[in-house]
Amino acid sequence: MALNIFQKQEVVEELAGVATKAHSLIVAEYAGITVSQMTAMRKQARESGVYLKVVKNKLAARALGDTEYAVIKEKLIGPLLYAFSLEDPGAAGRLIKEFSKKHDKLKSKTVSLGGVLYPAGHVDVLASLPTRLQALAMLARVLSEPVTLFARAIKAVADDKSETVAVSAPEASQA
C-alpha cells in the first residue's frame, strides 16, 4: 500500500526520533523471510529493547540524514530491515545474530555504532558486547577485588599468628 505525503512524514519523524535515542543500528536484508518468521523476530525485538522497522530506503535515508547514522546512506540498496538498539548497544546484534542462525535468509548488511560504519561481520562483535547489567556486574567485581584480596591477606596473617601462638604455647609449658 502506497503511503501519502503525511504518512511518509510521520514515518520519517518516527525513525529520526528513534535514531537519536538509539545506541547502534544494524541494517539487514530480509528477502525470503516469511511473515510468521518476521512476526516472531519482531516479538523478540520488543522483548530485548530493539526497535525493528522495514521502511523504504529513501525514507530511511531522509530520516537518518541528520543523525549519527547518516554514514549508512550509501549502503541502502534493496529490501532492508532496520534494527535500532535502544537499551544497550549489543541488543540488536544479539537479535540479528541469533535469528540469522535459524533463518539463513536474514543477512546483516552493515553496522553503525557511534557514527562509524562497520561491515556486516561486526554483528558478531556487537552481539558479544555485555548488557548493561553484565557490565555493571563486571565493574562491581573489579571494584571489590582489591578489597577482597586485602581481607584475605589480613585473615592469612591472623591465622599465621594464631598458629604461631598455639605452637609456642606448648613449647613454653615443656620448658
UniProtKB/Swiss-Prot annotation:
Gene3D superfamilies: 3.30.70.1730
CDD domains registered for this protein in UniProt: Ribosomal_L10
Domain of life of the organism encoding this protein: Bacteria
Keyword entries, A-Z: Ribonucleoprotein, Ribosomal protein, RNA-binding, rRNA-binding
Single GO term (MF): structural constituent of ribosome
Xref: InterPro entries: Ribosomal_uL10, Ribosomal_uL10-like_sf, Ribosomal_uL10_bac, Ribosomal_uL10_bac_type, Ribosomal_uL10_CS_bac
GO terms under biological process: translation
Pfam family, one: Ribosomal_L10
This protein's record includes keyword Ribonucleoprotein: yes
Cited NCBIfam families: PRK00099.1-1 (NF000955)
Family statement: Belongs to the universal ribosomal protein uL10 family.
Protein name, per record: Large ribosomal subunit protein uL10
Species of origin: Xylella fastidiosa (strain 9a5c)
Lineage of the organism: Bacteria, Pseudomonadati, Pseudomonadota, Gammaproteobacteria, Lysobacterales
